[in-house]
UniProtKB/Swiss-Prot annotation:
One of its GO terms (cellular component) is spliceosomal complex. Keywords: mRNA processing, mRNA splicing, Nucleus, Spliceosome. Belongs to the SPP2 family. This is Pre-mRNA-splicing factor SPP2.
Amino acid sequence: MSDKDPANSRIAIKFGASKAPLRPSPASALGKRARPHLLGGNASDSESDGEGRPADRAENITTIGAGADGRGRDTGSSKKPLTIPRQANRDWKSEKRARTNTTSTRQQADKEVEPVDQGKPLKWGLTLKEKGAKATEDAGGQAGEASTDQSDADKGADAKPEKTADEEAMEALLDEREDKKKRNLVIARAESAGAKEEEAFKQNFRDAPDVSTLEDYEEMPVEEFGAALLRGMGWDGKPRGPKTKDVKRRPNQMGLGAKDLKGQEDLGAWDQKGSSRSRPKRLNDYKREERERQDKRSHRGSESYKQERDRERYAAVYLGLCGRSRPSTGHRFMYGNAKISRQLMKD
């Protein structure tokens, strides 16, 4: 360590901002200039992605993914109404007919392929030999051609005697009748329930529509599903039926039956018909007015009676003073006025 020069082994570390280059970078072909860094220097290579963007520009990220470039843009193309094609109704009768035909075809194929031992009858218990036509033909084949009388005699010999009623009853009890022995009874094989269910599942699987994909679900909004079904069935898109009443929320502090004033309030227009239309009278007011009218009528009647008596008395006094038995027309007019009569009495 002592052999080495201590000046060469030193490491110099300097803190500070990067120095500006002596020569500015030339302008690019696109006409953009290199923008200075916020701290005074030029932007580094790691910040080349943000070059060309203003420092005060705000960006909002709305979509993240592969299709982010086209999702936020408005294509401007008019969207066609969505339509779901109508599927044909299921024909139960034809399905049942086809299922029946398939079952009958399978049974017929099973009958055509006979098992090996089907022609041989099962034997058990006491077995009796049956005289068949083959033994008769073999015996007669060696003799050659026989006469007609001999053949008739052989047929008569081979013919069985007629059975009596007792013998037929005995055979019926013992269940040994020949028609039952010769009869071949066949019981069709019953298909298992599992085979039927499997065939039905295969048929439904073949007739089922294609499975919807995720793209189909994304293209069909939930609120448009019912309208799309109706369009597939022939709906023209026009609403039918009675129009529903649009319920609107009332403004604040507006009661039932009140109407919103669209213009300014006209205070003078509130009582335009107030002079001609008065409020109905109350019972107390009506009774008070009726009493006043009655009082006026009674008072007027009493005054008129008094005035009439006064006029008669004044007329009698005047006639006595004048010496006349009947007043003239002018005097009658004067008698009608009480004040004039009083003045005459004073005179």
